[in-house]
UniProtKB/Swiss-Prot annotation:
Signal peptide feature range: none
Reactions catalysed according to its record: 7-aminomethyl-7-carbaguanosine(34) in tRNA + S-adenosyl-L-methionine = epoxyqueuosine(34) in tRNA + adenine + L-methionine + 2 H(+)
Name of this protein: S-adenosylmethionine:tRNA ribosyltransferase-isomerase
Cross-referenced Gene3D superfamilies: QueA-like (3.40.1780.10)
Broadest EC class assigned to this enzyme: transferase
Localization, UniProt: Cytoplasm
Coiled-coil segments on the chain, per record: none
Species this protein is from: Rhizorhabdus wittichii (strain DSM 6014 / CCUG 31198 / JCM 15750 / NBRC 105917 / EY 4224 / RW1) (Sphingomonas wittichii)
PANTHER family listed in its UniProt record: S-ADENOSYLMETHIONINE:TRNA RIBOSYLTRANSFERASE-ISOMERASE
Amino acid sequence: MRVDLFDFDLPPENIALRPASPRDSARMLLVEGSEGALADRHVSDLPGLLRVGDCLVFNDTRVIPAQLEGRRGEARIGATLHKREGLRQWRAFVRNAKRVRTGDRIDFGAGVSAIAAERGEDGSILLDFEGDEPVELLLERAGTMPLPPYIAGKRPTDDRDRDDYQTMFAREKGAVAAPTAALHFTPRLMEALAAAGIASETLTLHVGAGTFLPVKADDTDDHRMHAEWGRIDAATADHLNAIRAAGGRVIAVGTTSLRLLESATGEDGVIRPFDGDTAIFITPGYRFRAIDGLMTNFHLPKSTLFMLVSALMGRDRMQAAYAHAIAEGYRFYSYGDSSLLLPG
């Protein structure tokens, strides 16, 4: 399909630079049924919009401070880590990468440095961090939260982002982007969901910086996704299969949860344990096997994520839903409002 079929105009004022407070006060657009009926709600309404026996699936990845600023000699170098490849090695997208040669040492300050070990075909650079201290501790000292370009380009990252850009479920360190749909959840909301008979489960998918990259191809067939590591354990898979067998719905919270669930599910509709990389790319025409609904934020024009929601609900319906959201002043992207997509 042509990538420009997934384009739309978004006014800059619709881009959120800070999250709602409290988190569950964010607005939520309900898109429901084969006709894509729309209703303006709030995230706090979620317990009344789901059914007894449904299950929400959250991504428990934890964002690391993966944005680094350093120098190679006099040249300023910016690096965004996006995938771990060894005990001390991370693949990174590097600003001013042409100034970095294999074997160069980059000083990131605070006693943190790395050697440019190799250059990848995608233009990324493999960084080999020096010293014996765990890389996670080095990043805590020298790194900042890797906010998406559409936020970082409008304001500097600050200490608030260390909390704001982390979900309440964040446990497994390794993501360089937040699973943002889950940013809306609070302990109060989780208690209300449990009281309404709605279950929850977690899986892990370490979101990579590739999620921020634009689609450069003109046709979806020519686009290649970056691989991300994920895991679903046997107990979680068994529980989700039991939920569906009993007539409940599996609702993915975020596109990362959805993509991993679909990667772990066979043609028979059975969710299986998963431990490995996925580069699944979902576009219209895909047959969903694992999920019955999706809660997700509002995505970029011509992005792989807008293609995914178009696959779930239909491109025309999602174009209409986004036009409604823009007209009604919904806040877009990582710190923005939410949508609940129930194809019916």
